[in-house]
Amino acid sequence: MRGGPACAYNRAMLRIDTHAHYLPRDWPDLARKYGESRFPVIHHTGDGRHRIYKDGRFFREIWSRTWDPQERIDDYARFNVQVQVVSTVPVMFCYWARPQHALELHQALNDHMAATCRDYPRHYAGLGTVPLQSPRLAVQELERCVDQLVLQGVQIGSHVQLPDGQHWNLDAPELFPFFEAAADLGAAVLVHPWDMMGSDTMPKYWLPWLVGMPAEQSRAACCLVFGGVLERLPKLKVCMAHGGGSFPYTIGRIEHGFNMRPDLVATDNPHNPRQYLQRLYFDSWVADPAALRYLLDTCGVERVMLGTDYPFPLGEQEPGAVIAQVALDEPQQARLYHGTALEWLGLPASRFA
């Protein structure tokens, strides 16, 4: 997709950030309740700092804009972004936990998110979270998110670390009923990297985030493609966060492997993986205008939408800044800023008018 002559960016155009993380200020202390230190806990200190701890160790500092809906609206207004599609922080997935314990946390997060979306309907849409370690409970909570809480879908991790120490990739047969339910409900599914592969061997230089995250997204996309999940569920609406990680950028290698060793690669789906670039959605946060241009040319402007990873340091600090550096005509801008997002979410633009 090569854009026509660049036109001035319309500041009045609706802008929707599809990748924005959100937490309540406080959540149930399941580490204390169940004696399991792996559950994340929040500590608010006397000097005004807010820190998440996991396994008794510092994990991440967060700020009031992580949970204050009006502060977030005001922050986004500086960049003419009106709408945030909020999802939890992946450390909250807790797929390793007992399913009922994880469900307790997920329901609290989903209830809080839904209340924000109800209170600020012109500024928020929501993607809940579900305990994928129990597909039955995941489907149950997905249905509650969509039918009762009126959220637009759910965010899931790039793989599932199970309570017994095993794990499922997204092609696991056990997970197919969840994806089938999402397709039947018309729910949007956001796949986000978490629990990055190789983290134990990459203790320095922030490598799990810089190297592991793109690899996680490629693993997840390849499993959805090669496992036949997308082929069997043509109505399934999946967006790969972080621009799909390395998947779109290594599709040539992936396709070559498919062609040269179908005995290894095409065991569950006989179709060329390249064709699924037009089945998946991707957010725009690739941190480089040349990379975004490649993503648009390879996947199509109709498959890409604004996403920032707000409010974290690795995210886009000025929402839409990379998009603004790519020559696009106004219809193409409209697709990236809101058209693709509305299609993925199944919402009319009037929802945010």
Regions found by a protein language model. Give the residues of each.
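Residue-identity detector for glycine
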Residues: 3-4
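Catalytic metal-binding/acid-base residues of hydrolase active sites
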Residues: 21, 159, 194-195, 244, ...
